[in-house]
């Protein structure tokens, strides 16, 4: 049917004609929802239908019969049933924009010998093209001569009406996605800030942990160092105390020796009262004849002289002592000590074992010599080296077989040397001399003047002289 014939038709006639069954077309449910395929025309011309059709085509029973129908012999009643509307209505633009055409696969029509050859369905693209042509015919547009449309619509206007809706949906979707993206970016930014804050906290805690560890190690090292210093100080004080104890023991022995040696050897006799002198009774042989003749014996009194200890200082030696007293020193090269070394110390400490004697002198000078009694100590505790240098029955300095009641130790050595009482007295006399002059050097002797100090030194020299001559005192 051409468009020119439809130009003069009224609205009712055109609508009735539109309701009549059309030859060669299938039934289309115009009241169905808008087809997704038509909405997809704007987006892609090659997009295929993805939803299942919702329109069921109901062909006439005669169309399904096996008897072939001659061409151009179809009646209106033989066409597929048309959709039934409650009342005729005019489609406006809003309704057209919401119409969805669902096209199913066409059923084969029994036309003159053609139905036997159509065994396969047409593609979705062909169906879409047919549907579009049908739409263009159904809208009854008059594009050729520019006359007004019967329904006041055209394909272009329908597309224009439908396009803003799709664009609006896309814009809304784009805006929603954009908002979600912005929200996700804000959340990501917050997460990044939180991670950065936690990283700073972690770094700060790590730095504080390192500082705390370093301070703890430093404090521990400081405590260990202080403990080591205290231990070393305590050991030093203990060693000094032991040295002082040894010195005090030597001083006690020296004082005991001084007390024993200071007693007078010959007491002074006092004159008898009345001016009488003591006499000793006795008899003498009378050599003269007059004595015999007298017949009497004459008693002769024996008068003993009264003696006392006297002392006089050697001026040269006294002057040397005064010079040494002004600047006391333990250097043996000074004149005062050099004379004492030559006259008293060397002779007193000269023994047959010269090497051991030199070691004893060095220990006495350094104040590192110790003397202890043997007592009742078992022999098994005596070291082999000490036994080799002398045993309880052999003196290590003289090499003679003597009963050794004492033993000496030199410095930090672990060896002990057994000595006889004679050697012990000679060593202690020298030790007493060195102890006293050390006190003078350290300023500990304050209750005596120079003369008293000098005579005390001379008394100690006297003890050394007696010891080197063989005079000694043995403890019982």
Curated annotation (Swiss-Prot):
Molecular function GO terms recorded: GTPase binding; guanyl-nucleotide exchange factor activity; identical protein binding
Activity: how regulated: Phosphorylation by ATK1 alters its GEF activity. Complex formation with RAB11A and RAB11FIP3 and ciliogenesis function are competitively inhibited by RAB11A-WDR44 interaction.
Domain of life: Eukaryota
Keyword Hydrolase: no
Post-translational modification: Phosphorylated by AKT1; the phosphorylation alters its GEF activity.
Pfam families: Sec2p
Highest classification ranks of the organism: Eukaryota, Metazoa, Chordata, Craniata, Vertebrata
Species this protein is from: Homo sapiens (Human)
Tissue: Expressed in brain, kidney, heart, pancreas and placenta. Not detected in skeletal muscle or liver.
Protein's cellular compartments: Cytoplasm; Nucleus; Cytoplasm, Cytoskeleton; Cell projection, Lamellipodium
Protein name: Rab-3A-interacting protein
Gene encoding the protein: RAB3IP
UniProt region (Important for RAB11A binding), positions on chain: 435-444
GO biological process: ciliary basal body-plasma membrane docking; cilium assembly; Golgi to plasma membrane transport; negative regulation of filopodium assembly; protein localization to organelle; protein targeting to membrane; protein transport
Any one GO CC term of the record: ciliary basal body
Modified residues (Phosphoserine): 163, 165, 263, 266, 288, 296
Biological role: Guanine nucleotide exchange factor (GEF) which may activate RAB8A and RAB8B. Promotes the exchange of GDP to GTP, converting inactive GDP-bound Rab proteins into their active GTP-bound form. Mediates the release of GDP from RAB8A and RAB8B but not from RAB3A or RAB5. Modulates actin organization and promotes polarized transport of RAB8A-specific vesicles to the cell surface. Together with RAB11A, RAB8A, the exocyst complex, PARD3, PRKCI, ANXA2, CDC42 and DNMBP promotes transcytosis of PODXL to the apical membrane initiation sites (AMIS), apical surface formation and lumenogenesis.
Record has Transport as a keyword: yes
Keywords from the named record: Cell projection, Coiled coil, Cytoplasm, Cytoskeleton, Guanine-nucleotide releasing factor, Nucleus, Phosphoprotein, Protein transport, Transport
Bias type Polar residues, positions: 287-297
Disordered: region residues: 262-297
Subunit composition and interactions: Homodimer. Interacts with the N-terminal region of SSX2. Interacts with the GDP-bound forms of RAB8A and RAB8B. The interaction with RAB8A is prevented by phosphorylation of RAB8A at 'Thr-72'. Interacts with the GDP-bound forms of RAB3A and RAB3D. Interacts with DCDC1. Interacts (via the N-terminal region) with TRAPPC14; this interaction mediates RAB3IP association with the TRAPP II complex. Forms a heterotetramer with RAB11A where RAB3IP homodimer binds two RAB11A subunits.
Coiled coil, from the record: 165-260
Reported effect, residue 439 to A: Reduced complex formation with RAB11A
Family the entry assigns: Belongs to the SEC2 family.
